[in-house]
Amino acid sequence: MAHVVDSNTLDRIFAEVDRGFDQQMQMLSDLVAIPSCRGEESRAQDFMAHAMADLGLAIDRWKINVDEIRHLPGFSPVMVPYDDAINVVGTHRPSSGVGNPRR
């Protein structure tokens, strides 16, 4: 079942997006200025890890092991070395397991 968001909540969301727009565009500009083609991803990954950590997210990094993903649907043959291919993920871990109290 879809949750309908009232117009006041939508207005607040849009206002917050607008308020942070210039900062978001600067971050995107800084990110795309970093060379990040295959084999050169580490600086861009570090940039994103720092940005996500600044937001309070828990950072997880791991090296891609091609043998562990080879059997997965959609796997594409690897044509370049993955020696420096590191995945970076930021995860929000709430302070409590309680969901939205308004629901």
Describe the function of each predicted region.
Residues 2-103:
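Acidic/His- and Gly-rich active-site-bordering loop/insert found
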